[in-house]
Every structure is written in C-alpha cells, then in structure tokens.
C-alpha cells in the first residue's frame, strides 16, 4: 500500500509539470510585433497579420490595431500622415479657428468666440470662413477627408454691403413700375409710347424716326391729307381703313386681270406735269402742284396710296370723256350717294362727298360748267387717251381748254361748299 501511495503524488506531479511549459510557449507565440495584430483564424498557419489600412500598432502585444486619429473632428491640420506603426499627428488649428498651442488632442474653437489678442484670429478679423478647405492628404490606405463646415459671423463692412443691396433692389423695382404706369397713362391720352426709336422709310434708308400719323400739321397739307391723318390717329380707324384698302386691292386685282393695262403716252410739252403715280387725288378739286421730283402727297408720306373706287375705274375705262356725265346711270350693286351729294372719293365704305349749298329757294342750285377758249362739245374727240382717269383727261383737253365751276347768275354771294366723310353709317361734315 505504501509504495502505491507514494506513486500517486509523483504521478500527479509528473502529469501537472508540462502545463506551465505549454502555457508559456503558447503565450509567447501570440505576441505580435508593431504594425501587426493577432490573426483570429490560426488555421492558415500564421499567428499575426498586418494592420488594415487606416489602423496602426505601435508596440508588441496581442491587442488589435487601433484606428488613426481624425484631425478634421478637432478642426486641426494634419502635420504627419499616420502609418501602420504610427498614429496621425495633428498640427495647428484651421484658419479662423483657435486652440491651445502644442496640445493637438484638444479640439479647436471658432475665432468668433475668441477674446481679443488670440494668436491666429487677429488677421482674420474675428470671422470664421464658411466651408473651410482642409489640407486633406491621401493616406497610404486611400482614406478620403471630408472638409468641415463652420458658422459665419458678418463684420461691419459685409453688413453695410448687404444693407445697400437690400435698399437698391426695391428702388429699381419701383422705378420700373412707375415707368409702366406713366406709359399706360400716356397711351390713354393718345400719345405713342415706345421703348425704341422708330425709323421711317426714306430715300436714303433712314428717316426722322417719327410716326407719320403723329407729325405736326403742315401748312401746305391738302384737305384729304388732313382727313386721313385725323382718321388714322385712332388705332381702331387705322385698322378699319387697312381692311378697306385690302378689300379694294383685291377687287382691283380681279378687275385688272381680265383687261389689258393701258400705258400713259408721252404728253406734249405745253401740258402741265402730272404725278407719275396716277393712283390718288391730290386735292378735292383735282390735281395739285408739284413740290420737287414728286407730288406733295407723296413727299409728305403720311398715308398709303388712296386708290380710286371700282365704280370710277369701271366708268373711266368703259366710256372715257372730258366732262363728267351727270345723267349716267349708276352701276348695279354700287352704293348710291345721298341726294344732292357729289362723290369725290370712295374706297369701300369710306366715302368723301361734296355737298353744295342749299338755298332757301324752291329749287336746288345746279353746278354748271362752261368751256373757255376751246372747241365746241360736238368737236371733242370721243376717246383721246383711253385708260386715263377722269381728272387727268380733264387736264389733257385739246387746245389748252379748261373747265370752270360757276355759280347761278341770280346769286352773287360766295358759295360755301361742305365736304362729308362717310365711314359705314357715321358721317363727319367739314
């Protein structure tokens, strides 16, 4: 029994002896050098592995690698980029921030909070920059740095500039609204308000820049010119007159397409010069004198060409004569004038007529014409120049004869002629 009892403690001692040796051996194998950390998967045959990017291990040990310090969180610049064996070293504060000198672990504060005399905040005028650019250096692992964002405190100069902008913008807005209001008021009174200079047509490609409808009245302006100018001063009347002229032009094109156009033969030297246009009346009584290379109406350029009515053109081409025939039957479908009126010009619904003076006698006065220094009515040729308007045929009579309007011999008073302008159903008597 005794030998067995002695063997038991000995055997236990021999069994427990290898455990401390084994423990020491395993403990020394798990110590990793700087820049490495223990491998948690020892099945690959390695006990330590390198530190991942963005981490470091500065001494021997079994602890895992630690991440690098982030200087952006402390509002500091990176003085030295971290490696696998060394942490990132932070330097001075960002521009516009202040902090304890030589203590890189303490976060920096904005200069707007700093008292007077703090180093680094005097040159910035105690203002912090918005969106400060960070000197972000790419680390060995390629970690990106995010710039910080700070608050901004305005100084006296910046505040004054903001107040100036706030005061100027409403002033310009009010000036624009005032200009629009004044322009609308002028338009209601009949003025022409434009934002640019109007260039009128001229022989040299330029003009005076004034609308012809708004020019001052000329002393030598004829009666029809005054009437047309007064009518075209209103936009509604001008638009209606344009429609009438378009309708008249369309009728003229239809009529001239079915008959040949007769040309004006050269006139003899003793005949007075006639306007080459031959498409409008210069005065109520007939053709007017010339002023320069063209007629007075064309030189003034205050209205488009006023053409003869379709009835007058048809009467001229069908039966040309020197004197108007008062007994001629009006054309079917044409608008007849009122009793006692003599039509001077008719364009669509626009009609200019002459009203003789109505005497108190029982009979209406008649307009008589006589021919002076010329052949008798029986000797007049039938059609000396076919295709000419009536007023030009009266001027181009043979032998220099001319007609004259006479009053009845019973009356010695001056006859007053009144003219009426009819547009649709409304009349304007002058």
UniProtKB/Swiss-Prot annotation:
Residues 134-143 have a biased composition (Low complexity). Residues 27-162 are extracellular. It is found in: Cell membrane; Cytoplasm; Cytoplasm, Perinuclear region. Residues 134-156, 373-411 are annotated as: Disordered. The modification Phosphothreonine is found at residue 223. Disulfide bonds join 51-65, 71-90. It holds the Pfam family RELT. The chain crosses the membrane at residues 163-183. Residues 1-26 form the signal peptide. The keyword Glycoprotein applies. Keywords: Apoptosis, Cell membrane, Cytoplasm, Disulfide bond, Glycoprotein, Membrane, Phosphoprotein, Receptor, Signal, Transmembrane, Transmembrane helix. Phosphorylated in vitro by OXSR1. Phosphorylated by STK39. It is a single-pass type I membrane protein. TNFR-Cys repeats lie at residues 50-90. A motif (RFRV motif) lies at residues 349-352. Residues 184-430 are cytoplasmic. One of its GO terms (cellular component) is perinuclear region of cytoplasm. Glycans are attached at residue 149. GO terms for biological process: amelogenesis; apoptotic process. Its main location: membrane. Belongs to the RELT family. May play a role in apoptosis. Induces activation of MAPK14/p38 and MAPK8/JNK MAPK cascades, when overexpressed. Involved in dental enamel formation. Interacts with RELL1, RELL2, OXSR1, PLSCR1 and STK39. This is Tumor necrosis factor receptor superfamily member 19L. It comes from Macaca fascicularis (Crab-eating macaque).
């Amino acid at each position: 029994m005794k030998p067995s009892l002695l063997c038991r403690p000995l055997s236990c001692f021999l069994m427990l002896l290898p455990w401390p040796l084994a423990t020491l051996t395993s403990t020394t194998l798990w110590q990793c050098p700087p820049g490495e950390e223990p491998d948690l998967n020892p099945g690959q045959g390695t006990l330590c592995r390198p530190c991942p990017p963005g981490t470091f291990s500065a001494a021997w040990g079994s602890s895992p690698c630690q991440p690098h310090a982030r200087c952006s969180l402390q509002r500091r610049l990176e003085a030295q980029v971290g490696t696998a064996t060394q942490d990132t070293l932070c330097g001075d504060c960002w521009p516009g921030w202040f902090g304890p000198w030589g203590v890189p672990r303490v976060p920096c504060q904005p200069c707007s909070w700093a008292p007077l005399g703090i180093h680094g905040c005097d040159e910035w005028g105690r203002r912090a920059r918005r969106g400060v650019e960070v000197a972000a250096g790419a680390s060995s692992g390629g970690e990106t740095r995010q710039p910080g964002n700070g608050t901004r405190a305005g100084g006296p100069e910046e505040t004054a500039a903001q107040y100036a902008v706030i005061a100027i913008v409403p002033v310009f807005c009010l000036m624009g609204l005032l200009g629009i209001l004044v322009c609308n008021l002028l338009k209601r009174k009949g003025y022409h308000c434009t934002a640019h200079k109007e260039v009128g047509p001229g022989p040299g490609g330029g003009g005076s820049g004034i609308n012809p409808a708004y020019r001052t009245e000329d002393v030598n302006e004829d009666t029809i010119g005054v009437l047309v100018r007064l009518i075209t001063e209103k936009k509604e009347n001008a638009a209606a007159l344009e429609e009438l002229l378009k309708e008249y032009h369309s009728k003229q094109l239809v009529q001239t397409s079915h008959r040949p156009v007769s040309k004006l033969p050269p006139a003899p030297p003793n005949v007075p010069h006639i306007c080459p246009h031959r498409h409008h009346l210069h005065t109520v009584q007939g053709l007017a004198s010339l002023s320069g290379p063209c007629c007075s109406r064309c030189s003034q350029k205050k209205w488009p060409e006023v053409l003869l009515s379709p009835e007058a053109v048809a009467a001229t081409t069908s039966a040309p004569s020197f004197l108007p025939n008062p007994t001629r039957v009006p054309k079917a479908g044409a608008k007849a004038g009122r009793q006692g009126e003599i039509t001077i010009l008719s364009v669509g619904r626009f009609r200019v007529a002459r009203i003789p003076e109505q005497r108190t006698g029982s009979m209406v006065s008649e307009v008589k014409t006589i021919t002076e220094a010329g052949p008798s009515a029986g000797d007049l040729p039938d059609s000396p120049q076919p295709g000419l308007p009536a007023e030009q045929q009266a001027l181009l009579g043979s032998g220099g004869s001319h007609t004259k309007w006479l009053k009845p011999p019973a009356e010695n008073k001056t006859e007053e002629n009144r003219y009426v302008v009819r547009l649709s159903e409304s009349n304007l008597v002058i």
